[in-house]
């Protein structure tokens, strides 16, 4: 009786049942684009008599209220289906309804039509079924259910309790026979209201008796929407999600097949792959070329740097990530194009050809999510870079980024740890930026009595700030086109001359020099001049606006921004009113802000510096960081008043 009672409680909600009260969602999550009213899923492993094999059946049912036009996309669904050789996943039982509340109080129902169900080929191993509910508008409720069947027991669907819209009720049931063992992991910050485990009848019978099974029920209620904010890695690192990994499978009284791997197995599998390990041994392609790239009297560092720059110049990144090569090193060199693996495995081969010990580091990019560090698997990884060690200093190199300095990984790669896979072993290496993202502004000029400011503005960039600016410049057809765009988009002041230095050398600071004329920089107030002492670089928006943040702030690198302003005042002018000088820091000195205004021999000197001395802030540090930026914004909105001295 206990089993029956529990099973009845853990059940799907009725399809097609709707009431007028369901449309009244004004007070629930008032700022949401849409609301999941109910959501139910079940993953069940069954024995299929016709095929004589176990299959994984996944049932999904949801009901969503569309609050406004921004939520209309939630009436469109994409269901991925995996295929391999003759085996493939299938979908059936697709049924959908759109409900609209009419003015007379009646509820209109529009059934999903077959023409709104399309299957597209995504790749050789994956299709996508796209479902679009019809006649959806603001205030609609949509309902959808379907079932997928998979012969791939390792592909048990993850259950995403949290999404970008709130959910009132989300329920998932897994029903797994004892012959299958899964590692189950709940990640994110969603608290489950119910989690209980019960025995259930698998209906799988062997010559030795029935196979027992375990039913686990997971329920969460009133789940808030996940809110994306600046400075974070992939949201899927932090959304409340239930994941399953097949650990082992066994035939009753037969052998057990283990699916959980080891890092040694992962290394051996990669080194044995034609599009990975084979491409690491392409040293012969570079033996004849290297004498034109490096010289015998070079230091190992200089040789590595020269080879790094050579590969960057020979193979252009095609904007595709890859743990495995698309074209292979030889073809990438011939076509002068390739994905990240084509480029970086070529780099490793070239370094090895120069007798520099180079090995691959596999990693997961920031947008791909955090890999499971204690679960050896290839599927979590989508990228490879090169590792070398010179004079006891380790360097990670990515030659796919044409504007990255030697040893500084692109921001996309800064995602906690990567795995260094040598032929003799493996180890974890930190993925971190060696350089602070730095921008410095320096202005020297003269203020006229009519409020016009004229002078020279220098901006100097390093780290990711320089990389981003170089990418922006090279996205234009020419340097002159870039300058023209800057000229057109600069509305506060006129640029009379614009020079750029060190554009082609990422190892140097990128410098831009502009001769500017800023009319109405200062407002005339009686005989005084009143102005905010910023030409550019002013902080106007706080990147942190949540009341609390459950996931870390990840900046990618330390940040540094400074501004030095030297303005010669009109004759006999002096400071009459100015903001107070500021020297503030967080308690652990992880962030600091200086704002100093002074006058010397008729020249106004403004010095501003903001430093963020670590790349990651934990959730309990969030409010302090938010307040820190609020003080910066407040200080940079205050005026300085200068006028003729009364002496």
Give, region by region, the residue ranges found by the protein language model.
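Bacterial N-terminal signal peptides
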Residues: 1-4
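Sec/Tat signal peptide C-region and signal peptidase I cleavage site
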Residues: 6-10
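A sensor for short, sequence-defined functional sites
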Residues: 11-647
């Amino acid at each position: 009786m206990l089993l029956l009672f529990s099973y009845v409680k853990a059940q799907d909600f009725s399809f097609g049942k709707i009431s007028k009260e369901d449309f009244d969602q004004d007070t629930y999550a008032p700022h949401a684009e849409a609301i999941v009213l109910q959501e139910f899923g079940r993953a069940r492993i069954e024995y299929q008599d016709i095929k004589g094999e176990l299959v994984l059946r996944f049932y999904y049912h949801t009901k969503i209220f569309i609050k406004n036009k921004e939520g209309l996309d939630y009436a469109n669904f994409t269901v991925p289906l995996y295929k391999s050789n003759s085996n493939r996943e299938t979908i059936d039982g697709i049924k959908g309804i759109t409900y609209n509340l009419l003015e007379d109080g009646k509820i209109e129902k529009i059934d999903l039509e077959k023409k709104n169900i399309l299957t597209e080929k995504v790749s050789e191993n994956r299709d996508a079924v796209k479902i679009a509910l019809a006649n959806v508008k603001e205030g609609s409720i949509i309902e959808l259910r379907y079932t997928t069947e998979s012969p791939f027991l390792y592909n048990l669907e993850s259950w995403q309790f949290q999404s970008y819209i709130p959910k009132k009720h989300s329920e998932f049931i897994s029903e797994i026979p004892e012959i299958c063992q899964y590692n189950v992991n709940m990640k994110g910050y969603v608290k489950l209201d119910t989690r209980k485990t019960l025995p259930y009848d698998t209906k799988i019978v062997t010559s030795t008796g029935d196979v027992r099974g375990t039913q686990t029920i997971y329920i969460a209620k009133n789940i808030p929407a996940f809110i994306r904010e600046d400075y974070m890695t992939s949201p899927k690192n932090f959304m409340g999600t239930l994941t399953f990994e097949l650990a082992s499978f066994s035939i009753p009284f037969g052998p057990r097949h283990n699916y959980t791997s080891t890092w040694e197995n992962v290394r051996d599998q990669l080194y044995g792959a034609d599009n990975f390990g084979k491409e690491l041994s392409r040293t012969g392609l570079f033996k004849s070329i290297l004498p034109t790239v490096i010289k015998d009297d070079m230091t190992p560092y200089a040789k590595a740097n020269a080879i790094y720059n050579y590969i960057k110049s020979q193979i252009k990144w095609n904007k595709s990530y890859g743990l495995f090569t698309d074209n292979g090193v030889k073809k990438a060199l011939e076509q002068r194009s390739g994905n990240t693996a084509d480029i970086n495995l070529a780099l490793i081969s070239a370094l090895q050809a120069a007798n520099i010990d180079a090995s691959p580091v596999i990693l997961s990019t920031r947008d791909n999510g955090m890999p499971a560090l204690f679960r050896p698997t290839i599927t979590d990884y989508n990228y490879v870079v090169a590792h070398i060690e010179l004079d006891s200093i380790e360097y990670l190199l990515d030659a796919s980024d044409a504007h990255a300095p030697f040893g500084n990984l692109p921001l996309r790669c800064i995602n906690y740890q990567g795995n260094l896979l040598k032929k003799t072993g493996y180890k974890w290496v930190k993925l971190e930026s060696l350089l602070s993202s730095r921008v410095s502004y320096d202005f020297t000029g003269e203020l006229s009595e009519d409020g016009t400011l004229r002078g020279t503005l220098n901006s100097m960039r390093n780290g990711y700030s320089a990389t981003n600016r170089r990418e922006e410049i090279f996205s234009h057809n020419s340097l002159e086109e870039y300058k023209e765009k800057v000229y057109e988009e600069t509305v506060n002041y006129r640029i009379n001359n614009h020079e750029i230095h060190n554009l082609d050398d990422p190892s140097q600071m990128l410098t831009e020099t502009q001769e500017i004329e800023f009319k109405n920089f200062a407002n005339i107030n009686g005989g005084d001049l009143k102005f905010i002492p910023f030409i550019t670089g002013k902080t106007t928006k706080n990147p942190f606006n949540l009341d609390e943040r459950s996931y870390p702030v990840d900046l990618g690198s330390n940040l540094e921004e400074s501004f030095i302003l030297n303005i010669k005042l009109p004759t006999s002018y002096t400071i009459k009113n100015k903001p107070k000088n500021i020297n503030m820091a967080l308690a652990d000195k992880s962030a600091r802000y200086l704002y100093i205004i002074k006058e010397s021999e008729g020249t106004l000197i403004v010095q501003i510096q903001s430093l963020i001395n670590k790349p990651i802030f934990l959730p309990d540090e969030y409010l302090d960081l938010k307040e820190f930026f609020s003080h910066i914004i407040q200080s940079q909105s205050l005026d300085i008043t200068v006028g003729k001295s009364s002496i």
